[in-house]
Every structure is written in structure tokens, then in C-alpha cells.
Design a protein with these regions (language model features):
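Short conserved AdoMet
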Residues: 136, 212, 226
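A short glycine-rich, Lys/Arg-flanked "PGG" loop and its adjoining helix->strand segment in the class I
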Residues: 215-230
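Conserved N-terminal segment of class I S-adenosyl-L-methionine
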Residues: 1-205, 215-219, 283-284, 295-299, ...
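Short catalytic micro-motifs in class I SAM-dependent methyltransferases
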Residues: 203-212, 234, 257
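Short N-terminal helix/helix-N-cap motif within the alpha/beta-hydrolase-1
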Residues: 212-216, 243
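Short, glycine-/aromatic-enriched active-site segment of Class I SAM-dependent methyltransferases
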Residues: 40, 232-260, 265-272, 293-299
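Residue-level signal for the nucleotide or nucleotide-sugar donor/cofactor binding architecture
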Residues: 76, 209-213, 262
């Protein structure tokens, strides 16, 4: 399928100050490698006995070539399906500890909770509208947001009259959403107990890139859908302007946390392998904002002329399929 045509008049700007409260994004970047810092301090690297070889998480092939190294970890490209992924990795228990750690909860508080209301209005409502477009004739869709964080999409869906539920591993995020009256649970998908075929829509926003086995999770989500139901996901776009401008310094290349890197082609391939028909694919990002931040904070340079037209440039980046985030809606086949 083709990237949809977009009109510049429809471009919605992002209030960076509201999205990223003062200091919160820098804190996230500064603590990027914190889970491995002590290991590297003691050993000069990540000890080999802590790392586990991994085959391609999409097609299962072990045939891959070196792509790049960052943060003492290796990223490779599958020679069969072209997926880019981290290999080797830590075990699953390591990543679960990271996402429930006190430090990660602090990051969520500073970045997610403080911007929750803005995220609900700017992003939550937009995502609900995009899902609604794919669910005609369903007055009150039943919706599950997997990895819901503070529940800003769940809140927008609830306010639109949906039966909206969210699950997340981070207890601080879930507790905050519950304090707003949202139906959130601090539970893993595989332990949630939801019945197959019980949802009209399931979302995975900024989730698949974190998983050792994204196919297992995507398959579980597909099983929860009724025939004709949709899965809506966001993942970083490896073919984005961010990587073209900053190379491996692009912020989304974060191998201590992001284990899988998709392109429009490889994300469509993943959907097809799970009998999901891609019905919507677009890109959206803050590539120019992140690049200007990088130039200013890391390189000590200023690009005032670019800053003045960054929003307009970002529209064309998004429309050309080079935005930092891939937005994909895929439908469960009815046959």
C-alpha cells in the first residue's frame, strides 16, 4: 500500500514545552545507558555471559550482518527479511526489572504524568479518531491499550464513549491513570486473562521495539480481536530523517531498551506474517525538533534559520514517509 496523501493545512503542530516538561527529555537521554553503567564501570564492557544470542524476531533466521554498535551492544540486519535488531541481548527478566525499576518510574513521572493532559488532547484524541475511521458502524468499540503508560489514549477513548481498558507494567503510570478514573491494570498481557475475540481494537504504542519476542505479543493481540478488528501500533522508523541527520546518535537508536528497528517495508511484512492486513500506514515525528536539540545540546551549535521553519519541514518529512514514528493500523482477516 502507498503512504496516504496529506495536506499541509491538516498538519497539527506539537507544543514541545507541554509534551516534554522542562528537563524531562534531557533526563531521559542522560539516563539512556543507566541499566548497564555499573557493569561497564566494573568490566569495561557488558560481560559475555550476561548476553544471549538471538535469531531474527520476525522470520527466525540466524543469518545476519553487522549494522552498527552503540552503548556496548551490537545491532545487526537480517539477511532474509531485512529487519534490524539487537543481537545479542539480555534475558527477558532483565528488561522486566528495568521497566518496573524506581528510576524508570521516575522518568515516567517526569515525562508522562506531567504531560498527561496535553497528550490526551493532542495525541489521544487523534489516535481514537484514526481508529474510529476503521471501525464504522460500531457505536462503542471495546478497546485494549497494551503498554498504556498513564492511559492518555484510554482517557480519550473513554471520553468518546468507548469501553476502554489499559494495561502496563509500570505501577506509577497505572496508579496515576487510576486516580483519573481510568480502567487500568498493572499486569502483563500474557497474564491479563482477556478472552479471545473480545475486542474491536487493540493498540501497541511504543511497545514492539522493546520486546525480545514481538511476534508472540502481536499474535496474542490478534487473538484478542474479533474478526475484522484492528491493531494500531507505533514503532520508531529506522528509515527516518532522524537517523539520516544524526546517524547512530539518533535518540531512538537505544539498544539498551529498543531491541527491534522497523521500516515501512519490514513492519508490513510483520503484519502479513500474522494474517493482519495493513490498512493504514503513515509516519509522524519530531525529527527536526530532536535534531535541533542535538545540535544545540550535544554539538553546541545553533540553527536559528531552521528553527523558524521546523514545523513546515517536519510536515514534508512526515508526508514523505521519513517521520521518526511509524503509525500502522492492520485488520484481522475475516476469512
Amino acid at each position: 500500500m502507498q503512504i496516504p496523501y496529506r495536506r499541509v493545512e491538516e498538519y497539527q503542530k506539537v507544543d514541545i514545552g507541554a509534551l516534554r516538561p522542562a528537563g524531562s527529555y534531557k533526563q531521559l537521554i542522560d539516563k539512556r545507558t543507566h541499566p548497564i553503567d555499573e557493569l561497564v564501570r566494573q568490566h569495561g564492557k557488558i560481560p559475555d555471559d550476561l548476553l544471549i544470542p538471538r535469531t531474527c524476531p520476525t522470520c527466525g533466521s540466524a543469518d545476519a550482518r553487522h549494522e552498527l554498535d552503540k552503548d556496548h551492544l551490537r545491532i545487526v540486519r537480517c539477511n532474509r527479511c531485512d529487519l534490524v535488531y539487537v543481537n545479542p541481548t539480555f534475558d527477558e527478566a532483565h528488561y522486566k526489572r528495568v521497566y518496573v525499576s524506581a528510576e524508570y518510574q521516575e522518568i515516567v513521572r517526569d515525562l508522562g504524568i506531567k504531560s498527561h493532559e496535553y497528550r490526551t488532547k493532542r495525541f489521544g484524541q487523534e489516535r481514537v479518531r484514526l481508529m474510529s475511521d476503521q471501525l464504522p458502524g460500531i457505536a462503542s468499540p471495546r478497546f485494549l491499550d497494551v503498554g498504556c503508560s498513564t492511559g492518555f489514549v484510554v482517557e480519550a477513548a473513554r471520553d468518546a464513549g468507548w469501553d476502554a481498558i489499559g494495561i502496563d507494567l509500570n505501577p506509577s503510570a497505572v496508579e496515576y491513570g487510576q486516580s483519573r478514573g481510568l480502567n487500568l491494570r498493572a499486569v502483563a498481557l500474557e497474564e491479563s486473562g482477556y478472552k479471545p475475540g473480545s475486542f474491536d481494537a487493540v493498540s501497541l504504542f511504543d511497545v514492539l521495539e522493546h520486546l525480545l519476542d514481538p511476534v508472540r505479543t502481536l499474535r496474542a493481540c490478534a487473538q484478542l480481536l474479533r474478526p475484522g478488528g484492528i491493531v494500531f501500533l507505533y514503532v520508531p522508523n529506522y528509515d527516518s530523517a532522524s537517523r539520516m541527520l544524526m546517524g547512530k546518535d539518533a535518540h531512538f537508536i537505544w539498544p539498551t531498551h529498543h531491541l527491534n528497528y522497523y521500516t515501512p517495508a519490514t513492519i508490513r511484512d510483520l503484519m502479513t506474517r500474522q494474517s493482519l492486513d495493513t490498512v493504514y500506514l503513515a509516519t509522524e515525528g519530531l525529527d527536526l525538533v530532536d535534531y535541533l536539540w542535538y545540535r544545540r545540546e550535544v554539538q553546541g551549535r545553533s540553527d536559528d534559520g531552521v528553527e523558524e521553519i521546523a514545523d513546515l519541514l517536519q510536515f514534508f518529512v512526515n508526508a514523505g514517509a521519513y517521520g521518526k514514528n511509524l503509525r500502522v493500523i492492520a485488520r484481522k482477516q475475516t476469512r
